[in-house]
Amino acid sequence: MSFLKTSDPAVYNAIMQETTRLKETIDLIASENYTSKAVLEAQGSVFTNKYAEGYPGKRYYAGCEYADAIEELAIDRAKTLFHAEHANVQPHSGAQANMAAYFAMVKPGDTIMGLTLSHGGHLTHGSKANFTGKLYHVIEYGLNAETERIDYDNLEKLALEHRPRLIVTGASAYPRILDFERFRAICDKVDAKLMVDIAHIAGLVAAGLHPSPVPYADVVTSTSHKTLRGPRGGFILCKEQYAKAIDQAVFPVIQGGPLMQVVAAKAVAFQEAMQPGFVTYQKKILENTQVMAEELRKLGLRLVSGGTDNHLVLVDLSPIGVNGYDAQLALRRAGIVINRNTVPFAENQTANVPAGIRLGCPAATSRGFGPAEIRQTVSWIGKILKNIGNEDIEKQVLAEVIHLCRKFPVPGIDA
């Protein structure tokens, strides 16, 4: 970055500070990960200079022959990786992938169903604060209060009562396997379409370690980062009968030109996910997450649903008298990066000051952490949570965290 260092020291310094932060902290945010050096190089390539409105072979600008080649490569790889009939790799984000899917499948004012945000859903699944809550008539479904898993019986009851045009599944904080076959059966009973958002679990699905929604869903949306380890962006998979509607919804309805440098990086990430080592990596994520869950239980902490089937755990801190906001700040001061999160059915919580925290293992696993490092990290978490606001303990843990982190290079930066 010699040119940037000279031309814009302020931006250069911020990048260097962020690099140091990545090296000296343990990232347990379930939606974050480290990309490979190859993905970073593709995203920083000359494709950032190219406008490519339209689709391969049907561009509105000249000079798109290599943009076409890159996008076709990304499309083919996405289809192969997920065994899909059609793929659109242009969405700038998961939220925009979802928006395009809605615009293609339903009309404003139609009834849709989505998992309520406080039970692990996502803003784009029907939140009143989101465009979905403003454009559509949203019926929320939730979890069973005893099992803290999706209440499929009540979901079916609500579907039969309200007859939605679209049912959305997928989550941002749900630690259990989703029953796509049951969702499909419910949709068929009310003649609804099924949309599945696999943003969090795409890597697990690609590796065959979580059931795939592709055989059951009309449309599947995802991000290309998180467990998939690609660049920040989105993509859509669908059955061939919806291909034209999906493509038109992405362009020209919600986007103009695609970010071709990101499309190039997506192509690289899809190729990386096809390698045998990617399955091994995803298995390690699951192993580390099981170790994390067990160690958290040993500390006496309550896990939502009692455990996890995927890459994340949701911890209810209300029994120990700590809120998620204070926990997030204290752990950050100690070099452990997590996010606060609402807990299903918890009382006296808000989005800003929720009752719990969400922890995940994708980034730590990418860095090379195994069960031993996860156990050590959870022990530090326990020490911080039991001594909220104790600066001496926070400094002690921070020093130990930095010492551990120096043994594990950061993908894309150190290796």
UniProtKB/Swiss-Prot annotation:
PANTHER family: SERINE HYDROXYMETHYLTRANSFERASE (PTHR11680), SERINE HYDROXYMETHYLTRANSFERASE 1 (PTHR11680:SF35). GO terms for molecular function: glycine hydroxymethyltransferase activity; pyridoxal phosphate binding. Its EC number is 2.1.2.1. The gene is glyA. (6S)-5,6,7,8-tetrahydrofolate binds at residues 117, 121-123. The lineage of its organism: Bacteria, Bacillati, Chloroflexota, Dehalococcoidia, Dehalococcoidales. This is Serine hydroxymethyltransferase. It is found in: Cytoplasm. The record marks 225 as: Plays an important role in substrate specificity.
